[in-house]
Amino acid sequence: MVKNSFISVISQEEKDENKGSVEFQIVSFTNKIRRLTSHFELHRKDYLSQRGLRKILGKRQRLLSYLAKKNRVRYKELISRLDIRESKTR
């Protein structure tokens, strides 16, 4: 599997920017999630990787909720560019 096929244009644009920014972390978590979901198409019973996927999903969800609280405009722009669903508010 080629890692570069999962790295989006957004990740390339933000490579020069701050790697500690919330947006960059969300993009990198999204790339990891997409890589793991394609891995599960072949390896359905890889339970340790499924646990890792759930952990990454939780981290991304926490970062998305933080970004939604701090800057709603950047949050909306990021989820539209990454093509992910908006989180449900409680």
From Swiss-Prot:
Question: Would you tell me the protein name for this molecule?
Answer: Small ribosomal subunit protein uS15c
Q: PANTHER family, alphabetically?
A: RIBOSOMAL PROTEIN S15, BACTERIAL AND ORGANELLAR, SMALL RIBOSOMAL SUBUNIT PROTEIN US15M
UniProt main location, coarse: plastid
Write out the transmembrane intervals. Answer: none
What family is this? Belongs to the universal ribosomal protein uS15 family.
UniProt keyword Plastid, yes or no = yes
Q: Where in the cell is it found?
A: Plastid, Chloroplast
Q: Assembly and partners?
A: Part of the 30S ribosomal subunit.
Molecular function terms, GO-annotated: structural constituent of ribosome
State the NCBIfam families in the record. S15_bact
Per the record, the gene is: rps15
Q: Which residues fall in a coiled-coil region?
A: none
Q: Write out the GO biological process terms.
A: translation
PROSITE patterns, per this entry?
RIBOSOMAL_S15 (PS00362)
Q: Print the keywords alphabetically.
A: Chloroplast, Plastid, Ribonucleoprotein, Ribosomal protein
Which GO CC terms are listed, alphabetically?
chloroplast; ribonucleoprotein complex; ribosome
Q: Which InterPro entries match?
A: Ribosomal_uS15, Ribosomal_uS15_bac-type, uS15_NS1_RNA-bd_sf
